[in-house]
Amino acid sequence: MNIRGAPDLGQPSDDPNSGGERERIRQRMKMVIGQLEGILRELKEVAKELREVVSQIDKLTSDFDFELEPDDWTTATVSSTSSSDKAGVGGPFDLGHLDFMTADILSDSWEFCSFLDVSTPSDSVDGPEAPRPGTGPDYQLMNGGLPIPNGPRVETPDSSSEEAFSAGPAKGQVPQRTPGTRERVRFSDKVLYHALCCDDEEGDGEEGEEEEEGDLAPELPRVEPHTGPLKPSPAPYKTKRSPLTTRRLGPTLAPEQTRRVTRNSSTQTVSDKSTQTVLPYTATKQKAKGKN
Protein backbone atom coordinates (compact mmCIF):
# COMPACT_ATOMS: atom_id res chain seq x y z
CA MET A 1 0.00 0.00 0.00
CA ASN A 2 1.09 3.49 -0.75
CA ILE A 3 0.70 6.55 1.48
CA ARG A 4 -2.70 7.45 0.04
CA GLY A 5 -4.14 4.05 1.05
CA ALA A 6 -4.40 2.59 -2.47
CA PRO A 7 -3.37 -1.05 -2.84
CA ASP A 8 0.11 -1.66 -4.18
CA LEU A 9 -0.11 -3.74 -7.39
CA GLY A 10 3.58 -4.66 -7.55
CA GLN A 11 4.70 -1.47 -9.28
CA PRO A 12 7.94 0.10 -7.98
CA SER A 13 7.35 2.99 -5.63
CA ASP A 14 8.84 6.05 -7.26
CA ASP A 15 7.00 8.46 -4.93
CA PRO A 16 9.35 11.29 -3.91
CA ASN A 17 7.54 11.73 -0.52
CA SER A 18 8.72 8.34 0.79
CA GLY A 19 12.36 9.19 0.06
CA GLY A 20 12.05 12.52 1.86
CA GLU A 21 10.76 10.86 5.06
CA ARG A 22 13.67 8.41 5.07
CA GLU A 23 16.12 11.26 4.73
CA ARG A 24 14.52 13.06 7.66
CA ILE A 25 14.73 9.95 9.85
CA ARG A 26 18.40 9.48 8.96
CA GLN A 27 19.19 13.08 9.80
CA ARG A 28 17.46 12.77 13.17
CA MET A 29 19.40 9.61 13.97
CA LYS A 30 22.67 11.30 13.07
CA MET A 31 21.77 14.27 15.26
CA VAL A 32 21.01 12.01 18.25
CA ILE A 33 24.26 10.11 17.74
CA GLY A 34 26.17 13.39 17.63
CA GLN A 35 24.55 14.51 20.90
CA LEU A 36 25.48 11.21 22.58
CA GLU A 37 29.08 11.58 21.39
CA GLY A 38 29.18 15.08 22.85
CA ILE A 39 27.86 13.77 26.20
CA LEU A 40 30.55 11.08 26.23
CA ARG A 41 33.25 13.67 25.58
CA GLU A 42 31.95 15.79 28.47
CA LEU A 43 31.93 12.76 30.78
CA LYS A 44 35.52 12.01 29.86
CA GLU A 45 36.48 15.58 30.66
CA VAL A 46 34.73 15.33 34.06
CA ALA A 47 36.60 12.11 34.81
CA LYS A 48 39.90 13.82 34.01
CA GLU A 49 39.02 16.71 36.32
CA LEU A 50 38.14 14.29 39.14
CA ARG A 51 41.47 12.53 38.72
CA GLU A 52 43.27 15.85 38.95
CA VAL A 53 41.34 16.72 42.13
CA VAL A 54 42.21 13.39 43.70
CA SER A 55 45.88 13.84 42.86
CA GLN A 56 45.86 17.33 44.40
CA ILE A 57 44.23 15.96 47.56
CA ASP A 58 46.91 13.29 47.79
CA LYS A 59 49.63 15.91 47.46
CA LEU A 60 48.07 18.13 50.14
CA THR A 61 47.54 15.29 52.58
CA SER A 62 50.91 13.63 52.06
CA ASP A 63 52.38 15.57 55.01
CA PHE A 64 49.74 14.30 57.47
CA ASP A 65 50.28 10.98 59.28
CA PHE A 66 46.93 9.21 59.68
CA GLU A 67 47.46 6.50 62.32
CA LEU A 68 44.38 4.91 63.79
CA GLU A 69 44.37 4.43 67.56
CA PRO A 70 43.74 0.93 68.95
CA ASP A 71 40.37 1.97 70.42
CA ASP A 72 39.11 2.99 66.99
CA TRP A 73 39.23 -0.59 65.68
CA THR A 74 35.89 -2.30 65.98
CA THR A 75 34.30 -5.43 64.65
CA ALA A 76 32.42 -3.34 62.09
CA THR A 77 35.61 -2.03 60.52
CA VAL A 78 37.02 -5.53 60.23
CA SER A 79 33.84 -6.92 58.69
CA SER A 80 33.62 -4.00 56.25
CA THR A 81 36.97 -4.71 54.63
CA SER A 82 37.02 -5.61 50.98
CA SER A 83 37.60 -9.07 49.57
CA SER A 84 41.06 -8.09 48.36
CA ASP A 85 42.11 -7.25 51.92
CA LYS A 86 40.70 -10.50 53.24
CA ALA A 87 42.42 -12.63 50.64
CA GLY A 88 45.67 -13.05 52.57
CA VAL A 89 47.93 -15.86 53.57
CA GLY A 90 45.67 -17.32 56.22
CA GLY A 91 42.37 -16.86 54.45
CA PRO A 92 39.45 -14.66 55.51
CA PHE A 93 40.05 -15.44 59.20
CA ASP A 94 43.65 -14.22 59.19
CA LEU A 95 43.59 -11.05 61.33
CA GLY A 96 47.21 -11.10 62.38
CA HIS A 97 48.24 -8.10 60.31
CA LEU A 98 45.48 -6.00 61.89
CA ASP A 99 46.59 -6.75 65.48
CA PHE A 100 42.95 -6.85 66.45
CA MET A 101 43.24 -9.43 69.23
CA THR A 102 45.75 -7.52 71.34
CA ALA A 103 44.96 -6.46 74.92
CA ASP A 104 45.21 -2.76 74.11
CA ILE A 105 42.56 -2.94 71.43
CA LEU A 106 40.16 -5.04 73.50
CA SER A 107 40.65 -3.13 76.75
CA ASP A 108 37.18 -1.62 76.72
CA SER A 109 35.50 -4.91 75.91
CA TRP A 110 37.37 -6.78 78.66
CA GLU A 111 36.39 -4.11 81.19
CA PHE A 112 32.78 -4.43 80.13
CA CYS A 113 32.90 -8.22 80.45
CA SER A 114 34.44 -7.95 83.92
CA PHE A 115 31.66 -5.56 84.91
CA LEU A 116 29.08 -8.08 83.76
CA ASP A 117 30.83 -10.85 85.70
CA VAL A 118 30.77 -8.79 88.89
CA SER A 119 27.16 -7.64 88.56
CA THR A 120 25.75 -11.01 87.43
CA PRO A 121 26.15 -13.94 89.89
CA SER A 122 27.37 -17.24 88.48
CA ASP A 123 25.05 -20.23 88.75
CA SER A 124 27.76 -22.89 89.00
CA VAL A 125 30.27 -21.25 91.38
CA ASP A 126 28.55 -18.62 93.49
CA GLY A 127 25.24 -20.41 93.97
CA PRO A 128 21.99 -18.64 94.80
CA GLU A 129 22.31 -15.11 96.05
CA ALA A 130 21.62 -14.73 99.77
CA PRO A 131 18.74 -12.42 100.65
CA ARG A 132 19.65 -9.09 102.15
CA PRO A 133 19.07 -8.90 105.92
CA GLY A 134 16.34 -6.64 107.21
CA THR A 135 14.40 -6.48 103.97
CA GLY A 136 11.12 -8.15 103.17
CA PRO A 137 9.62 -9.12 99.84
CA ASP A 138 9.42 -6.52 97.11
CA TYR A 139 5.69 -6.77 96.57
CA GLN A 140 3.41 -4.35 98.35
CA LEU A 141 -0.05 -4.43 99.81
CA MET A 142 -2.91 -3.88 97.42
CA ASN A 143 -4.78 -1.93 100.12
CA GLY A 144 -3.92 1.61 99.02
CA GLY A 145 -0.48 0.73 97.62
CA LEU A 146 1.24 1.31 100.97
CA PRO A 147 4.96 0.41 100.95
CA ILE A 148 4.52 -2.14 103.75
CA PRO A 149 5.84 -5.71 103.42
CA ASN A 150 2.95 -8.08 103.04
CA GLY A 151 2.49 -10.93 105.45
CA PRO A 152 0.16 -12.54 108.01
CA ARG A 153 -0.34 -9.48 110.18
CA VAL A 154 -3.32 -9.24 112.52
CA GLU A 155 -3.41 -5.46 112.64
CA THR A 156 -3.70 -5.15 108.86
CA PRO A 157 -7.44 -4.82 108.08
CA ASP A 158 -9.06 -5.50 104.79
CA SER A 159 -10.35 -2.61 102.70
CA SER A 160 -13.92 -3.97 102.75
CA SER A 161 -14.09 -4.53 106.53
CA GLU A 162 -15.11 -2.00 109.15
CA GLU A 163 -11.90 -2.64 111.07
CA ALA A 164 -10.15 -0.08 108.85
CA PHE A 165 -11.82 2.69 110.88
CA SER A 166 -10.30 1.53 114.17
CA ALA A 167 -6.81 2.57 115.27
CA GLY A 168 -5.58 -0.91 116.14
CA PRO A 169 -6.73 -4.45 116.95
CA ALA A 170 -9.16 -4.93 119.79
CA LYS A 171 -8.13 -6.72 122.95
CA GLY A 172 -10.52 -9.60 122.41
CA GLN A 173 -9.63 -10.09 118.78
CA VAL A 174 -8.55 -13.47 117.46
CA PRO A 175 -4.76 -13.46 116.93
CA GLN A 176 -4.87 -15.35 113.61
CA ARG A 177 -7.67 -15.28 111.06
CA THR A 178 -8.06 -16.29 107.47
CA PRO A 179 -8.16 -13.16 105.27
CA GLY A 180 -11.37 -12.85 103.30
CA THR A 181 -13.84 -14.75 105.50
CA ARG A 182 -14.69 -12.14 108.08
CA GLU A 183 -14.52 -9.30 105.61
CA ARG A 184 -17.17 -10.93 103.43
CA VAL A 185 -19.57 -11.06 106.39
CA ARG A 186 -18.84 -7.43 107.13
CA PHE A 187 -19.48 -6.55 103.53
CA SER A 188 -22.89 -8.24 103.65
CA ASP A 189 -23.69 -6.29 106.82
CA LYS A 190 -22.76 -3.08 105.04
CA VAL A 191 -25.03 -4.01 102.13
CA LEU A 192 -27.88 -4.56 104.60
CA TYR A 193 -27.05 -1.25 106.23
CA HIS A 194 -27.22 0.57 102.89
CA ALA A 195 -30.52 -1.15 102.13
CA LEU A 196 -32.07 0.07 105.38
CA CYS A 197 -30.51 3.53 105.47
CA CYS A 198 -30.55 6.07 102.66
CA ASP A 199 -27.07 7.51 103.06
CA ASP A 200 -24.06 7.27 105.35
CA GLU A 201 -23.88 11.05 105.62
CA GLU A 202 -27.09 11.12 107.67
CA GLY A 203 -25.39 9.46 110.65
CA ASP A 204 -25.40 12.64 112.73
CA GLY A 205 -29.12 13.21 112.07
CA GLU A 206 -29.89 9.63 113.01
CA GLU A 207 -28.02 10.03 116.28
CA GLY A 208 -30.15 13.09 117.13
CA GLU A 209 -33.34 11.27 116.23
CA GLU A 210 -32.19 8.28 118.24
CA GLU A 211 -31.80 10.44 121.35
CA GLU A 212 -35.26 11.98 120.87
CA GLU A 213 -36.86 8.59 120.36
CA GLY A 214 -35.02 7.32 123.43
CA ASP A 215 -36.73 10.06 125.44
CA LEU A 216 -40.14 9.37 123.91
CA ALA A 217 -39.93 5.60 124.21
CA PRO A 218 -40.70 5.34 127.96
CA GLU A 219 -43.71 7.67 127.55
CA LEU A 220 -45.57 5.38 125.11
CA PRO A 221 -46.60 2.76 127.72
CA ARG A 222 -48.02 5.50 129.98
CA VAL A 223 -50.29 6.98 127.30
CA GLU A 224 -51.72 3.68 126.08
CA PRO A 225 -51.45 0.98 128.74
CA HIS A 226 -54.28 -1.13 127.25
CA THR A 227 -52.53 -2.06 123.98
CA GLY A 228 -52.31 -5.64 122.74
CA PRO A 229 -49.53 -8.19 123.17
CA LEU A 230 -47.63 -6.71 120.21
CA LYS A 231 -46.56 -3.74 122.32
CA PRO A 232 -43.02 -4.24 123.69
CA SER A 233 -42.14 -3.50 127.29
CA PRO A 234 -39.80 -0.63 128.27
CA ALA A 235 -37.11 -3.15 129.22
CA PRO A 236 -35.85 -3.79 125.64
CA TYR A 237 -35.40 -0.07 125.13
CA LYS A 238 -33.33 0.15 128.26
CA THR A 239 -31.22 -2.83 127.30
CA LYS A 240 -30.60 -1.44 123.82
CA ARG A 241 -29.97 2.08 125.04
CA SER A 242 -27.82 1.30 128.03
CA PRO A 243 -24.75 -0.07 126.16
CA LEU A 244 -24.89 2.77 123.67
CA THR A 245 -25.07 5.45 126.32
CA THR A 246 -22.35 3.83 128.38
CA ARG A 247 -20.13 3.53 125.32
CA ARG A 248 -20.70 7.12 124.32
CA LEU A 249 -20.06 8.46 127.83
CA GLY A 250 -16.99 6.29 128.41
CA PRO A 251 -13.80 8.45 128.33
CA THR A 252 -11.51 5.52 127.48
CA LEU A 253 -12.75 4.93 123.92
CA ALA A 254 -10.85 6.37 120.97
CA PRO A 255 -12.70 8.52 118.38
CA GLU A 256 -12.21 5.85 115.72
CA GLN A 257 -13.80 3.20 117.96
CA THR A 258 -16.64 5.61 118.78
CA ARG A 259 -17.29 6.01 115.07
CA ARG A 260 -17.34 2.25 114.68
CA VAL A 261 -19.87 1.91 117.52
CA THR A 262 -22.16 4.50 115.96
CA ARG A 263 -22.02 2.76 112.59
CA ASN A 264 -22.81 -0.63 114.12
CA SER A 265 -25.71 0.82 116.15
CA SER A 266 -27.32 2.54 113.16
CA THR A 267 -29.01 -0.69 112.10
CA GLN A 268 -30.50 -1.03 115.60
CA THR A 269 -31.81 2.52 115.32
CA VAL A 270 -33.62 1.62 112.11
CA SER A 271 -35.12 -1.49 113.70
CA ASP A 272 -36.34 0.59 116.66
CA LYS A 273 -37.91 3.06 114.25
CA SER A 274 -39.74 0.27 112.47
CA THR A 275 -41.19 -1.11 115.72
CA GLN A 276 -42.15 2.34 116.97
CA THR A 277 -43.97 3.26 113.78
CA VAL A 278 -46.10 0.11 114.05
CA LEU A 279 -47.30 0.86 117.63
CA PRO A 280 -49.56 3.90 117.01
CA TYR A 281 -51.09 2.24 113.93
CA THR A 282 -52.00 -0.84 115.96
CA ALA A 283 -53.43 1.26 118.77
CA THR A 284 -55.71 3.27 116.46
CA LYS A 285 -56.94 0.11 114.81
CA GLN A 286 -57.86 -1.41 118.15
CA LYS A 287 -59.61 1.83 119.16
CA ALA A 288 -61.65 1.74 115.96
CA LYS A 289 -62.72 -1.83 116.72
CA GLY A 290 -63.68 -0.80 120.26
CA LYS A 291 -65.88 2.02 118.98
CA ASN A 292 -67.66 -0.24 116.52
Curated annotation (Swiss-Prot):
The family classification in the record reads: Belongs to the INSYN1 family.
The superkingdom listed in its UniProt entry is Eukaryota
Name it: Inhibitory synaptic factor 1
Keyword Coiled coil included in the entry's annotation:
yes
Q: Which residues form a coiled coil?
A: 30-63
InterPro entries annotated for this entry?
Largen/INSYN1 (IPR027997)
Compositional bias (Basic and acidic residues) spans?
A: 180-192
Q: Where in the cell is it found?
A: Postsynaptic density
Assembly behavior: Interacts with GPHN.
Keyword Coiled coil in annotation: yes
Q: Name one GO biological process term.
A: chemical synaptic transmission, postsynaptic
Compositional bias ranges of the Polar residues kind: 263-285
Which Gene Ontology cellular component terms are annotated?
A: GABA-ergic synapse; postsynaptic density; postsynaptic specialization
Q: What is its main location?
A: other
Q: State its role.
A: Component of the protein machinery at the inhibitory synapses, probably acting as a scaffold. Inhibitory synapses dampen neuronal activity through postsynaptic hyperpolarization. This synaptic inhibition is fundamental for the functioning of the central nervous system, shaping and orchestrating the flow of information through neuronal networks to generate a precise neural code.
Please list the residue ranges that the record marks as compositionally biased, kind Acidic residues: 198-216
Q: Which UniProt keywords apply?
A: Coiled coil, Synapse
Q: Where is this region: Disordered?
A: 1-25, 120-292
